[in-house]
Amino acid sequence: MEHKAPLVEFLGLTFNLSDMLMITITCLIVFIIAVAATRSLQLRPTGMQNFMEWVFDFVRGIINSTMDWQTGGRFLTLGVTLIMYVFVANMLGLPFSVHVNGELWWKSPTADATVTLTLAVMVVALTHYYGVKMKGASDYLRDYTRPVAWLFPLKIIEEFANTLTLGLRLFGNIYAGEILLGLLASLGTHYGVLGAVGEHSMMVWQAFSIFVGTIQAFIFTMLTMVYMAHKVSHDH
């Protein structure tokens, strides 16, 4: 079932209050996890510190698979932030949704293409920034004409394609999952005998959606590092 988004206009611009709320909640959750995991560091990690160190090691492995550590080590914090943010954002809409006067307030922020495409644009812009910073503007721009100059138009198209696919892949998977969860919940509420089937199917789909949300967080972070490697490594 489709629900309206709570929109407000300010200075000629339209803002989605639901997106703003859920983005803020996602940031707060990630911040709280990070603080809780690093508040009292110990030589023998336990609990949250152990989890956070595992996340760092996991992201370190992603970076090492795309570029050498001397080049990619500086992106460790970026990778950890991305994978935690996208994972939490993907999970928020799974347990429940909140509707007020026909408006959808509680959902996964990544179920909105505006959010995922904005995140993709920011990530791709960051790869360009580090490409210029680490290779120099002239050497960076020459990459668009290597190995032959006629590839320049194709490489420009590739930049737009990478941005679109990075954002839309994440949006499509999370949005489709929430739509199906809503349909199964509606089936369980309104269709009698089929209600039990709907409820059990919803639990199975929620478990699958957790898996999908986790994989999408990994893919988004991995592709970010792949794009970064293409911009900052001299052998690409």
Curated annotation (Swiss-Prot):
Keyword Transport carried by entry: yes
InterPro entries named among the record's database cross-references: ATP_syn_F0_a_bact/chloroplast, ATP_synth_F0_asu, ATP_synth_F0_asu_AS, F0_ATP_A_sf
A GO CC term attached to the entry: plasma membrane
Keywords: ATP synthesis, Cell membrane, CF(0), Hydrogen ion transport, Ion transport, Membrane, Transmembrane, Transmembrane helix, Transport
GO molecular function annotations of the record: proton-transporting ATP synthase activity, rotational mechanism
Record-linked HAMAP family: ATP_synth_a_bact
Protein name per its UniProtKB record: ATP synthase subunit a
Taxonomic classification: Bacteria, Bacillati, Bacillota, Bacilli, Bacillales
